[in-house]
Amino acid sequence: MGNCAKRPRHRAPKDRELRPEEIEELQAAFQEFDRDRDGYIGYQELGACMRTLGYMPTEMELIEISQQISGGKVDFEDFVELMGPKLLAETADMIGVRELRDAFREFDTNGDGCISLGELRAALKALLGERLSQREVDEILRDIDLNGDGLVDFEEFVRMMSR
């Protein structure tokens, strides 16, 4: 599979060349999920990574992609080949990873990488302009908090914003 140092021109197949800011957006999303910084993301993280770019893959699409991936991992060049056409086809109103990351940081006031119950309450008050009851905030958190740890991490935030 590819190495981004070898192929500096990023092309989306059968389409115009990706602009530098589009490459940067793909790079930011890729790096977000390349947690061990080995230049690859696993099939499991690929779906979450795609969602940060505003693309909602079905389980079937992810299974098909995983069958095409050798070794269960995707490097950045393969990621560009996969996501380039989707990025080029996206509509102007789709939210990119940079905007999602900025919004997440606004809510994560202590910068620990998670949105706590208190931070969520403050964010909802700022967004809605009214104070919600403890029960309402708990209900919202339960709906968003997929892993049940009482916090909203970036992936859970992306899923919430994509609904």
From Swiss-Prot:
For molecular function, the Gene Ontology terms on record are: calcium channel regulator activity; calcium ion binding
Superkingdom is: Eukaryota
Where, by residue number, does Ca(2+) 1 bind? 34, 36, 38, 40, 45
Give the SUPFAM superfamilies listed for this entry: EF-hand
Residues where Ca(2+) 3 binds = 145, 147, 149, 156
What broad class describes the main subcellular location of this protein?
cytoplasm
InterPro entries per record: CaBP1/2/4/5, EF-hand-dom_pair, EF_Hand_1_Ca_BS, EF_hand_dom
Provide the Gene Ontology terms for cellular component.
cytoplasm; Golgi apparatus; perinuclear region of cytoplasm; plasma membrane
Q: Which residues bind Ca(2+) 2?
A: 108, 110, 112, 114, 119
Its topology with respect to the membrane? Lipid-anchor
Subcellular location as annotated: Cytoplasm, Perinuclear region; Cell membrane; Golgi apparatus
This protein's UniProt keywords: Calcium, Cell membrane, Cytoplasm, Golgi apparatus, Hearing, Lipoprotein, Membrane, Metal-binding, Myristate, Repeat, Sensory transduction, Vision
Short name of one Pfam family: EF-hand_7
* Residue ranges constituting the EF-hand domain according to the UniProt record: 21-56, 72-89, 95-130, 132-163
Q: List the GO biological process terms.
A: sensory perception of sound; visual perception
Give the residue numbers of the N-myristoyl glycine lipid attachment.
2
Q: What is the protein's known function? A: Required for sound encoding at inner hair cells (IHCs) synapses, likely via inhibition of the inactivation of voltage-gated calcium channel of type 1.3 (Cav1.3) in the IHCs. Required for the normal transfer of light signals through the retina.
**PANTHER family the record matches:** CALCIUM-BINDING PROTEIN 1-RELATED (PTHR45917), CALCIUM-BINDING PROTEIN 2 (PTHR45917:SF2)
Q: What is this protein called?
A: Calcium-binding protein 2
